[in-house]
A protein has these predicted regions:
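Conserved nucleotide-sugar donor-binding
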Residues: 35-36, 114-127
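Catalytic donor/gating beta->alpha subdomain of glycosyltransferases that bind UDP-sugars
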Residues: 126, 134-195
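Membrane-embedded multi-pass helical conduit in multi-pass membrane proteins
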Residues: 206-280
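Conserved donor NDP-sugar-binding/catalytic core segment of glycosyltransferases
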Residues: 50-83, 87
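Short aromatic/hydrophobic "clamp" motif used to bind/position activated sugar donors
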Residues: 39
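A recurrent flexible, glycine/aromatic-enriched loop bordering the glycosyltransferase active site
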Residues: 74, 95-119, 134-136, 142, ...
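Glycine-rich, basic loop-to-helix element that forms the pyrophosphate-binding segment
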Residues: 18-34, 55, 104, 108
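Acidic donor-binding segment of Leloir-type glycosyltransferases
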Residues: 1-21
Length: 289
């Protein structure tokens, strides 16, 4: 779905220019043009495993399955700073209940998948398209939430694999994290998207805890407890950074620093998104979203 017309020497491909709109609107245009029963979404900075579609489509043999997909892992050729970003997202204390989006885990039903690796029944997508595509990022959360009503299934299969190039640490990675935090704060205020909503408020609490710790170290009676809490957190992120860096073949110091900054930036973004109660309004106006 390019912005402008594109000519390809392949008669099997149907290219539909969408105009300068965000990815959520591009998906809606594609769904309205095609007559296929199943829509497959992937990002332009991702590429699929050769068996991606076969491993995902097989789940739709069950009529109760409405959405299927798998992880978007870090490509082996990414730069060291990109691999550090992938390791940060692979950390259990960063992505928590959404970790399956970034690493291969066991097959199971989940409450949400990332739109960079997501297949959905076309009728289910179109039924709620206007509601879910109002937001970006975050439209994949609403899509899965709406699609999985009335006992429908969202299936995660590690064999339905795509490779997703990461944003290099620290600038590009943290800008992405800020955007994620903003939409999560907005959703926490306006919408209940899953039973895991409380987990997403933890980084915001972490930011507020920084303020409390700074206040505590100025008080002799609380100074010991403040140092103990800071030491426990440092040990936790150190352990997690080493595990993630080893698994993703990334620089542990970049991962350690990145986990800490990701917690701060995501938490601050969550607070701002919740306080403003809006979802990137300037960008929506710019793109007609």
């Amino acid at each position: 779905m390019p912005d402008d017309p594109l000519v390809l020497d392949n008669e099997r491909l149907h290219v539909v220019p969408s105009g300068p709109v965000l990815p959520n609107r591009k998906r809606q245009v594609a769904a309205e043009v095609t007559t296929a029963e199943i829509l497959a979404f992937i990002d332009d900075d991702a590429y699929p495993d050769p068996d991606w579609l076969a491993n995902a489509v097989r789940h739709f043999a069950d009529p109760n399955v409405v959405v299927a997909g798998g992880p978007a892992v870090t490509p082996p050729g990414d730069s060291p700073r990109q691999r550090a970003s992938g390791a940060i997202f692979a950390s259990e204390i960063v992505t928590a209940t959404t970790r399956h989006r970034y690493v291969a885990e066991r097959q199971r039903d989940v409450y949400g998948l990332a739109s960079c690796n997501l297949l959905v029944r076309r009728d289910a997508f179109l039924r709620d398209a206007e509601a879910s595509v109002r937001y970006w990022p975050g439209e994949d959360i609403l899509l899965c939430m709406f699609a999985a009503r009335d006992g429908a299934r969202v299936v995660y299969d590690p064999a339905a694999l795509v490779y997703h190039h990461r944003r290099a640490v620290f600038g590009a990675h943290l800008r992405q994290v800020w955007s994620y935090g903003r939409f999560r704060g907005f959703f926490l205020r306006r919408l209940s998207t899953s039973q895991h909503d409380g987990v997403y408020a933890i980084p915001a609490a972490f930011v507020l805890a920084h303020v409390a710790l700074l206040a505590a170290v100025t008080r002799p009676r609380l100074r010991g407890a403040a140092y103990l809490a800071a030491g426990a957190y440092a040990a936790l992120i150190g352990w997690s950074a080493l595990r993630a860096a080893r698994a993703e073949r990334a620089n542990p110091w970049l991962v350690l620093t990145g986990i800490y900054l990701t917690h701060l930036v995501y938490g601050a973004g969550t607070i701002v998104g919740w306080l403003r109660g809006d979802h990137s309004p300037a960008e929506r106006r710019k793109h007609g979203n």
